[in-house]
Amino acid sequence: QVQLLQPGTELVKPGASVNLSCKASGYTFTSYWMHWIRQRPGQGLEWIGGINPSNGGTNYNEKFKSKATLTVDKSSSATYMQLSTPTSEDSAVYYCARWDYEGDRYFDVWGTGTTVTVSS
């Protein structure tokens, strides 16, 4: 069974960076790009960026280039997204999602989501 597991919640103080995790299982981890998407309350989905687990290559939404850093740990089949200097505007649900680039080219598996609350 393909799964992407994420922590349920993260409470972050403004300006304090946070590292979000996405643990994959049930498939060959290095065969699919992993992307990160967020949804702020009452807003639509925003694509943040993606990472190639096989070589660490990344692709970012210009809006998040100075905000998010994607990394990978092949030994634990996990990807990470560090959010730097978060503000209340970064309070959102953050999802990882697997990209099916060889099939229909869409996000075919989604993580459980991490609710990030930025508050002092």
Swiss-Prot record:
A Pfam family this chain is assigned to: V-set
S-S bridge residues: 22-96
Alphabetical UniProt keywords: Adaptive immunity, Disulfide bond, Immunity, Immunoglobulin
D segment, as annotated region: 99-105
Ranges for region V segment: 1-98
GO biological process, one term: immunoglobulin mediated immune response
Ranges for region J segment: 106-120
SUPFAM superfamilies, per database record: Immunoglobulin (SSF48726)
InterPro entries with a match to the protein in the record: Ig-like_dom, Ig-like_dom_sf, Ig-like_fold, Ig_sub, Ig_V-set, IgHV
GO MF annotation terms: antigen binding
Entry GO CC: extracellular region; immunoglobulin complex
UniProt keyword Metal-binding, yes or no: no
PANTHER family: IMMUNOGLOBULIN HEAVY CHAIN
This protein's name: Ig heavy chain V region AC38 15.3
